[in-house]
């Protein structure tokens, strides 16, 4: 599995050119993309500026000597490469297994070319087997949890060392065990309108390419009408 993730990450790095502003994703597959960018910066003199999606990726990029800018300092990002937890046949996805969904979506939004790197196990017919992360403000989180429970969404707070996990932005995550999401756009719209929800892990209609590593090698899938 690690070898597949590395293949996908290294393949994605080939899309990075001199002078680009590059969004650096978070997670076990995006990690290899960031490592390869670091190698190219140091060994090939690649000239890029990175914008990170989590404190973990910031530390990784700094350790590799990749020049960084804050997202507030830029208007557009040329290319962002990130992982995904599930991708359906319509190129909608669930992200946020690494608890960085809010920053990931903020970086993805001004990106001209958005690429996901995954291993083939992440490609699914329908989203929902992977729990959907919902980032919520701490105030009123228990009430919101009960709302999700009554709706039958099987919520659970994301935990870390027996405490509720706190994201880089200071929020909680409620994971929804939905099994299947029949209408991802409608479900996203409902969450967007829910007071107390900061962001959710449905990334619908956002990605341009999905790089999939499998036993037969690497495939680059182009999203329709992108």
Curated annotation (Swiss-Prot):
The UniProt record gives the binding positions of substrate as: 26-29, 82-85, 95-98, 122
Q: One Pfam family for this entry, by name? A: Rib_5-P_isom_A
Q: Which domain of life is it from?
A: Bacteria
Task: Please cite one Gene Ontology biological process associated with this protein.
Answer: pentose-phosphate shunt, non-oxidative branch
Which GO MF term does the entry hold, naming one?
ribose-5-phosphate isomerase activity
Question: Can you state which reaction this protein catalyses?
Answer: aldehydo-D-ribose 5-phosphate = D-ribulose 5-phosphate
Keywords assigned by UniProt?
Isomerase
Q: Where is the active site?
A: 104
**Keyword flag Electron transport:** no
- List the InterPro entries hit by this protein, alphabetically: NagB/RpiA_transferase-like, Ribose-5P_isomerase, Ribose5P_isomerase_typA_subgr, Ribose5P_isomerase_type_A
- The EC number(s) given in the record are 5.3.1.6
Task: Spell out the NCBIfam families in the cross-references.
Answer: PRK00702.1, rpiA
Show the HAMAP family listed in the entry.
Rib_5P_isom_A
Q: Which PANTHER family match?
A: RIBOSE-5-PHOSPHATE ISOMERASE 3, CHLOROPLASTIC-RELATED
Assembly and partners?
Homodimer.
Give the family this protein belongs to, as stated in its UniProt record.
Answer: Belongs to the ribose 5-phosphate isomerase family.
Q: What is this protein called?
A: Ribose-5-phosphate isomerase A
| Provenance organism | Streptococcus uberis (strain ATCC BAA-854 / 0140J)
